Amino acid sequence: MSKSYVSRIVKVGNIKELNFRRSVSISQAPTGIQGDISTTTTYEENIKNAENLKAGNVLETAEFKALGTPQSVLSINCPPSVPVYLRRGSLLSIYGLNDSSSIKNVRSSINFINPIRRLLFGINTSSYQRLESTTPFSLLISATYRKFSIFKKSDNKSFVTISLDGSTDWSILYRDALQVYTGNSLTVSQYRVPRTISRKLSRTLNIPSNTTTGLFKWNKSGFIFLSGRGQVGLVGNGAIYNINLDDKEELLINRDNLLGLTVNGPFDLQNCVVEHNFTTHEKRSESSSVVQKPLGISVILKQQTTVRHKFKQIWSLFQYHLEASFSFLRGSRNKTNNFLVGNQNFVKIIGPRNLLLQSSSETSHIETPTPKRKNGVEVANVTGPKQTSADYLSYVTVTPGQGVKFESTPDFKDTVDKIERK
């Protein structure tokens, strides 16, 4: 705003009169906020629908927080001098450092966890990246990892975090589940999956002691055992759910969807898991299903040497082998029915337990290259009918009253002879 003043003297008689003229100019105030136009940051409220990641400055233990929907990224706030072990190829970012000089404080190394036992038990990953710093820092971990393979696996994975306080152990049955863990007193080990149930469970359920657990596979014969105190980040296929079983409560679950469960020691799986097969036909009575093998022929010959007793013994042996053959066929039929309806994949879990259930199982396939296309349309070699060149001769016939008629002929000689004969 500017102002100007102009004075004018007017003399009236002996009186002087002063007249003033004032001009005022008004300009519109700027509507924008004046500031540094070269700034590289903006206000937090200008960024919508994105979770703000804040680094932890004062921590005693690591903090795990799953992000996203599905939860495919894990944010970790790490205290100083506490190592973090993560699967190689899963690290997305390191942030929360005060200045560029603090990056030098982060130390990285490779740690191998029982590679021979993991190879024998069918557990894939044995190498983990170890990160440690003398100052607090934060990490972003992906649920997937970069690894060369001819088999294309599903990338629909999500995180679940577990805090171990030393009172409960965990058995992780999915071999690719352990993605990241930390804790100075946390123990990660491998054990073989039990094939049969314990005698204690067989007496409780009143079933034979040689009943299988349903968890054992020749290509996946081991599981990861977690004990002690620490933080663990597990990944599973699809969404992950928690199921709590009370005392003596039972649950049927597909073993391919069982991510892990709580146990009391590394040998407690045989006390809570048993294979379950759905009944597909009416079972026979126990008395008729048991086949007793007759005495040997040599024993009968020593006791009775008559032809009648020899015939009875031979007939008894024939009945025994015939019944054994029918029993084998019935067992094969039961196994075939169970395989067709998928019963062989179900196991029964007996509480009290905590279960982690993944909504989908691991699938893999060989990725085949797609054919090359030009401009989005596949070019195909299409051959049409071949056209041969030929000479065509035409002549015109003018007939009074009929007009002009055009005709074609391969040879003028035949046409001329025909016209002359007319």
Curated annotation (Swiss-Prot):
Compartments where located: Mitochondrion
Chief location bin: mitochondrion
Transit peptide interval: 1-23
GO cellular component: mitochondrial inner membrane
Keyword RNA-binding found: no
Signal peptide: none
Any one Gene Ontology BP term: inner mitochondrial membrane organization
Similarity annotation: Belongs to the AIM24 family.
Full protein name: Altered inheritance of mitochondria protein 24, mitochondrial
